[in-house]
Amino acid sequence: MDQTDQTTHFGFRDVPLGEKQTLVNDVFHSVASRYDLMNDLMSGGLHRVWKDIMINTLNPPKSDAPFALLDVAGGTGDISFRAAKKAGAGFHATVCDINGDMLEVGRQRALKQYLDDRVSFVEGNAESLAFPDRSFDAYTIAFGIRNVPQIDLALAEAYRVLKHGGRFLCLEFSTVEVPGLDKLYDLFSFNVIPQLGRAVTGDAESYRYLVESIRQFPRPNAFAEMISAAGFSRVSWQTLSGGIVALHSGWRL
């Protein structure tokens, strides 16, 4: 069965598997220039806290020892910049994203922050990474894996490119656990976020998709099983902010 015969979800719509990546690309082409501003508005700045927790969990070495990070779906560079500022002189991050517009925003940000010698940008597909086996000490993906058409392939690639002892970290939206907060969160997500998107980027539909894609993503226990199935060991997760997001971890051992 080829991709024209298979379907997957794009938000709440079913689409041919081969079309999802193009549709996702269109979303991020549309919002790239205002993506970071919208993250602040949508989360009330909480995304900064969640990303700091991710980097503290990664804990890149502060020594001169070489440490190679692959930040997939890293687009505008937020995760890599945070890691570079925390790490020692031996650190280098490679941001890999399928969307050239997002990468260009990241390159400009790297120049402004004088991090262009420590963070590089490569256009590529999470399902088929153009890196040799066992190339990286860590693999991060923040708010990106739910947009990948075939998540199992992305996880297999993450495992392949990690060195023995390498760590996989994934920050992704999850299922709200606090009674009452779930209803408020839905109200904000489906009614406010698309209108914020319209006001800031001129595009409500892209943000409607992003909200819908959160609801379609597996619950933390189900996603943890997918991580384990890809070969990772010591798989765990922690929920943050009442379950709005989850930080998943696994090791190649």
Swiss-Prot record:
Q: Which GO annotations describe the biological process of this protein? A: aerobic respiration; menaquinone biosynthetic process; methylation
* GO MF entries: 2-methoxy-6-polyprenyl-1,4-benzoquinol methyltransferase activity; demethylmenaquinone methyltransferase activity
Q: Which reaction does it catalyse?
A: a 2-demethylmenaquinol + S-adenosyl-L-methionine = a menaquinol + S-adenosyl-L-homocysteine + H(+); a 2-methoxy-6-(all-trans-polyprenyl)benzene-1,4-diol + S-adenosyl-L-methionine = a 5-methoxy-2-methyl-3-(all-trans-polyprenyl)benzene-1,4-diol + S-adenosyl-L-homocysteine + H(+)
Which EC main class describes this enzyme?
transferase
Q: Which InterPro entries match?
A: SAM-dependent_MTases_sf, UbiE/COQ5_MeTrFase, UbiE/COQ5_MeTrFase_CS
Keyword set, alphabetical order? Menaquinone biosynthesis, Methyltransferase, S-adenosyl-L-methionine, Transferase, Ubiquinone biosynthesis
Pathway membership of this protein? Quinol/quinone metabolism; menaquinone biosynthesis; menaquinol from 1,4-dihydroxy-2-naphthoate: step 2/2; Cofactor biosynthesis; ubiquinone biosynthesis
Q: From what superkingdom does this record's organism come? A: Bacteria
This entry's Enzyme Commission designation comes to: 2.1.1.163, 2.1.1.201
Q: Which residues bind S-adenosyl-L-methionine?
A: 76, 97, 125-126
Q: What's this protein's family per the entry?
A: Belongs to the class I-like SAM-binding methyltransferase superfamily. MenG/UbiE family.
Task: State the protein's purpose.
Answer: Methyltransferase required for the conversion of demethylmenaquinol (DMKH2) to menaquinol (MKH2) and the conversion of 2-polyprenyl-6-methoxy-1,4-benzoquinol (DDMQH2) to 2-polyprenyl-3-methyl-6-methoxy-1,4-benzoquinol (DMQH2).
What HAMAP family would the database entry show? Answer: MenG_UbiE_methyltr (MF_01813)
Protein name per the record = Ubiquinone/menaquinone biosynthesis C-methyltransferase UbiE
Q: Which gene encodes it?
A: ubiE
